[in-house]
Amino acid sequence: MAGELADKKDRDASPSKEERKRSRTPDRERDRDRDRKSSPSKDRKRHRSRDRRRGGSRSRSRSRSKSAERERRHKERERDKERDRNKKDRDRDKDGHRRDKDRKRSSLSPGRGKDFKSRKDRDSKKDEEDEHGDKKPKAQPLSLEELLAKKKAEEEAEAKPKFLSKAEREAEALKRRQQEVEERQRMLEEERKKRKQFQDLGRKMLEDPQERERRERRERMERETNGNEDEEGRQKIREEKDKSKELHAIKERYLGGIKKRRRTRHLNDRKFVFEWDASEDTSIDYNPLYKERHQVQLLGRGFIAGIDLKQQKREQSRFYGDLMEKRRTLEEKEQEEARLRKLRKKEAKQRWDDRHWSQKKLDEMTDRDWRIFREDYSITTKGGKIPNPIRSWKDSSLPPHILEVIDKCGYKEPTPIQRQAIPIGLQNRDIIGVAETGSGKTAAFLIPLLVWITTLPKIDRIEESDQGPYAIILAPTRELAQQIEEETIKFGKPLGIRTVAVIGGISREDQGFRLRMGCEIVIATPGRLIDVLENRYLVLSRCTYVVLDEADRMIDMGFEPDVQKILEHMPVSNQKPDTDEAEDPEKMLANFESGKHKYRQTVMFTATMPPAVERLARSYLRRPAVVYIGSAGKPHERVEQKVFLMSESEKRKKLLAILEQGFDPPIIIFVNQKKGCDVLAKSLEKMGYNACTLHGGKGQEQREFALSNLKAGAKDILVATDVAGRGIDIQDVSMVVNYDMAKNIEDYIHRIGRTGRAGKSGVAITFLTKEDSAVFYELKQAILESPVSSCPPELANHPDAQHKPGTILTKKRREETIFA
């Protein structure tokens, strides 16, 4: 009874054969059949073990009826075994699915199928070995003593020098080289593949979805027509297409191709834009006979078929004219004659008004004529209520005795600065004149001064001579002061006006004696004038006219404190009011003619307007009228500028080559240092050239002697420093050589301004070195602005000539380099 119960429980606990058969899926059955075919020995072993387990369980179940404890343990054991069996079945199912996948992959790639087959063969061999019991003995691990002995032997072998023959060394080097080449090729190939993958990926991402779908469909159709090709074949086709596209793009880029212009049509365009080009028009005749019509060449007044078209038109117009004349009444004829008369009168008046300003009288000039006049002479003014310029000396309001002196001095026509500055000066207004060197500035401030001094009674001038001069003219250099003195004496001596020059290099006692004798005009340099004022040789009690000539040069030379000190010695009582009254011409003219109670008039002439000059003008000038003449601060349009880049040692050889070209004297050569000036002049004299020097180290007599020799023609070449760069007027200078480039562009402009004066042309040659790179940019701009000069490519393309010194260049985003 107990045995039957145990059998029943065993049947309940263990699944029946039918259930196990039912639970087996067709896949499992198929896998088992395959395994059975591939390894029959494994299948036999599995059946034996299963029968053994079943037989053992039956015998144990019969002997277990004695004890419930043993039954319980048996059930648990059977349950564990069943669980293990189910787990094995599940693993087998998974292996079956995996094998199916491997089979599918092997159909696509033959390499994988081979791997799977070899693995399967290895498994079957292993099973056979297990079955026959031919197991290889396992390798035993080495002992510690063996390891140490082996390591010691290797170290001794490495320590011993090994001799290699030449052939072995060559073979080893060749092998290493081959390995390096292979490694490099492998890396390049990997890099190429990565780049290609990246490009393909980017192309696919940028590709239009519709275009991508179209391309995939086309590739699919090609694969269907060509058979099932592998991935490598498709990749090869794709690479060939990419290469053909790349070749087409290269041909289009370098061999030229017809670029299809994109047709755009705006919404507001009425004209329809067709898709074809004008060159595709098929209506054009290809036959040149019809394409180009024959034109009959006629001689003289010949006409085709005896018909003259012009004659026909004339006869037709005459016919209609006669017809209209017959139909008009007498009143209509008179009305037409009156209309024509009025039209002729209007045209005559228009022609009269449109005359050039030179053909008109002064009272006929209109505002438009004055504008044209200023444009003709490049006169630009700034400031309120500025008077009109003078057209000629006769049209000016100057006294007859002044005009007579002007005529005797040889001034036929006024220069542009004189045309505008003299009328402003006669109104007692402050003036800032910005004009190039050699423009006649001296007469522009002298003539209004002489006009005012001659209006004063001569007795008062003699009695009040101890109160100082009426006017002070300040110049930056002795040479310029002496030149102004010559011009002033030329104008003032016929009028009885005395002039004294207070400059360095001459005895101060002699100058003091001349000042005590009395004078109306003092021409001075700032340093010596302060010395004379502090030693009480001179007072400025009645000084009402101050002229600052070459004001920018004075500021550059450091005379700004001296100029301010001189202006502080002036009386304060005669200063102009800083109101609109200073711009009123009637009040200023009345004050100008009042005699002793005249307001102080300050005149400043400069070639450039740096900030320091503007600051000085704001401090001491009251509502000034600013006059700009031409391109002030720029080189003459008549001076041809030439530039040569060279080293310091090549300068002398180049200078001799230039002098041998036969330029007419006088010639001025500028250097930067006094010592270099003397050395260059001596070397030129040794080579047979007549040269003289002029610099700050020379005494006054030596300077005057050098200038007089050059003007008289006794010397041909003047070697000078920047002392001669400004204000010195030497007639007919044919060439200026900048042996040493000036330190700034303003000094360069004044240097080359010594030539090309009085309407004549000149040549300015400059030697440049690497040390002059600070002025390359401004020099390049000055040469480019000149119509008669050409900039050499060495200077135009030089890196320092591309931007102004001190400017911070910002790179464009496309020029930036990002270091990752």
From Swiss-Prot:
Motif (Q motif): 391-419
Domain Helicase C-terminal span(s) in chain numbering: 651-799
GO molecular function: ATP binding; ATP hydrolysis activity; mRNA binding; RNA binding; RNA helicase activity
E.C. no: 3.6.4.13
Keyword Acyltransferase: no
Biased amino acid composition, Basic residues: 43-65
Gene3D superfamilies: P-loop containing nucleotide triphosphate hydrolases
Keyword Phosphoprotein: yes
Bias type Basic and acidic residues, positions: 1-42, 66-105, 112-137, 147-226, 233-244
Residue ranges of the region described as Disordered: 1-244
Family the UniProt entry places it in: Belongs to the DEAD box helicase family. DDX23/PRP28 subfamily.
Purpose: Involved in pre-mRNA splicing and its phosphorylated form (by SRPK2) is required for spliceosomal B complex formation. Independently of its spliceosome formation function, required for the suppression of incorrect R-loops formed during transcription; R-loops are composed of a DNA:RNA hybrid and the associated non-template single-stranded DNA.
Protein name: Probable ATP-dependent RNA helicase DDX23
Organism per entry: Homo sapiens (Human)
